[in-house]
Structures are given as C-alpha cells and as structure tokens.
UniProtKB/Swiss-Prot annotation:
Gene3D superfamilies: Ribosomal RNA adenine dimethylase-like, domain 2 (1.10.8.100), Vaccinia Virus protein VP39 (3.40.50.150). Its EC number is 2.1.1.182. It catalyses: adenosine(1518)/adenosine(1519) in 16S rRNA + 4 S-adenosyl-L-methionine = N(6)-dimethyladenosine(1518)/N(6)-dimethyladenosine(1519) in 16S rRNA + 4 S-adenosyl-L-homocysteine + 4 H(+). GO terms for cellular component: cytosol. S-adenosyl-L-methionine binds at residues 20, 45, 68, 91, 113. The keyword RNA-binding applies. It holds the Pfam family RrnaAD. It is found in: Cytoplasm. This is Ribosomal RNA small subunit methyltransferase A. It comes from the Bacteria. It comes from Blochmanniella pennsylvanica (strain BPEN).
Length: 267
C-alpha cells in the first residue's frame, strides 16, 4: 500500500487521519466557535495544529488542552506551540473528563475534527460527561452529522438521533467541502454545535432503558412497534400511552420513546 505524507507526516489510514488545510475554512470555523481567553478549551485530535494555531491567535489563551494519540503528531505539536499547549498523549476513549474539568476548575469547551472511524462511538462516550461540558463543536462526516439532528419520519432518524438530542441541543453550522482536507475524503463534512441541556426537555427516570428500547426498536426499523417491541410491551400497553402500535421506529418522537422508557422502568 502506497504511503501518503502530509507536511512530512506519515498519514495513518487505520486512524482515518485527514488534515484540514483550507485557511478560509479554518478561519470560519474558529470564528463560529468564538473562543474566549478565560475559557478552557480542549481540542480532540488536533493533527498538525490547523485549528490550534488559529484559536491561540484569536483568543490569546493562556493554555489550550490537546488530546492526541499519535506520538509523531504529539512531538510536532510540542515543537510548534511549546508552552502554549497542555498536550495529553492518550486515547480519547479512555479520557476522564470529570477529572479534567475538576483540574481546570470549570466546564470544558470541546472542539475537533473527529476521525470518521470513531466519531459515533466517541459522541456517545462523551454524553456521560455532559455535566462538565459547556459545549462541543465537532466536524463530522456529513452522513453522520445529518443523523445527529434528524427528525422523526426522516430516513436519517434513528437511535443516534434520539440519544444525541436527548442529551444536547444540536445545531448544524457549516458544510465543509471535501477539497478542504488532505487526503481528500469521498464525502463532505459538517461542523456541528452540541450544547448539553441544562434542563432536559425529555424527563426520564433511567437513560439505560431508553438506550435498550431504541436499540431494539431500530434493530429492524421496518417492523411495527407491536412487533419490534413485543419483548417489552404488549399492544395494549403501547396504545394506553397514546402511541399507535402500527407505527414504525422512525415515526416515534423522542418524547414518546421517553414515555415508553419510563413505562419499561416501572415494570
């Protein structure tokens, strides 16, 4: 397999490494994030520091926290930014954000161009830390991004839409052409803002029940609820909650799923 380099860095395909190179796009993203000097900003997967450099220039931060697992990139970043960054050489999926927030004494603002291969898994992982996250600005593959903010009755609407919107207000901000990256990916990307709810609009007793329920419902999404959820409920129970059991998983609102999750928790 042919080796590909970007600015003398050997790109690791196994980690889905792509590098943002369009300065106009970089400027627009950072202006949209609007970083402030007093804020604690953490960048996930900074790569070669395209966003890092611009954020430090715009916000004049005392320190920017970076999490990077690629040791070659860690060394490059240290050389580039020296004392302006606090870089953590570790896997983001093992990072304890409660500890990080406690150390800096405030909620964190998270940013990053997320690797395509872990974007969905990472977002779900971060939801356990929403109490210590102020907001998140991430670049996603467009297909993933549209699933995050999809509404019922749309083909993109699914379990990820429900879990994401349960935890956060989701705002699509920018569409980024594939040519803004190297290597050029096959799809466009989108910058999304995820703002954790301070008061959830979806009251629920046990989030685990919502997770189990939606996993079952969307496993065979073309089945009607009377069939897909028969493990948990009979048809009468679904009807008693004002939900038509002849509907399919993609027709059910988040509020309705929360109602069913609460009923399941009481069983």
């Amino acid at each position: 397999m042919k080796k590909i380099y970007y600015k003398n860095h050997l790109i690791k395909k196994k980690w889905s490494q792509v590098f943002l190179k369009d300065q106009n796009v970089i400027d627009t993203i950072v202006k949209t994030i609007n970083p402030k000097k007093h804020q604690k900003i953490l960048e996930i997967g900074p790569g070669l520091g395209a966003l890092t450099k611009q954020i430090l220039n715009i916000a004049d931060l005392d320190s920017l926290i970076l999490i990077e697992r690629d040791s070659n990139l860690v060394n490059r970043l240290v050389q580039m930014f020296n004392k302006k960054i606090n870089i953590l050489h570790q896997d983001i999926m093992t990072t304890n954000f409660f500890d990080l927030s406690h150390k800096v004494g405030q909620k964190l603002r998270l940013i990053g161009n997320l690797p395509y291969n872990i974007a969905t898994e990472l977002i779900v992982y971060l939801f356990q830390y929403t109490n210590v996250i102020y907001d998140m600005h991430f670049m996603f593959q467009k297909e993933v991004a549209t699933r995050l903010y999809a509404n019922p009755n749309k083909k993109e609407y699914g379990r990820l839409s429900i879990i994401t919107q349960y935890h956060c207000k989701v705002v699509p901000l920018l569409t980024i052409p594939a040519t803004s990256f190297f290597p050029i990916p096959k799809v466009e990307s989108m910058v999304m803002r995820l703002l954790p709810h301070t008061n959830t609009p979806y009251p629920i007793v046990n989030i685990g029940k919502l997770s189990s329920l939606t996993k079952l419902a969307f496993r065979q999404r073309r089945k009607t609820l009377r069939n897909s959820l028969s493990t948990f409920f009979n048809e009468t129970e679904i009807t008693q909650k004002g939900i038509n059991p002849a509907l399919r998983a993609e027709n059910i609102t988040i509020n309705q799923y929360c109602t069913l999750a609460n009923m399941l928790n009481n069983k």
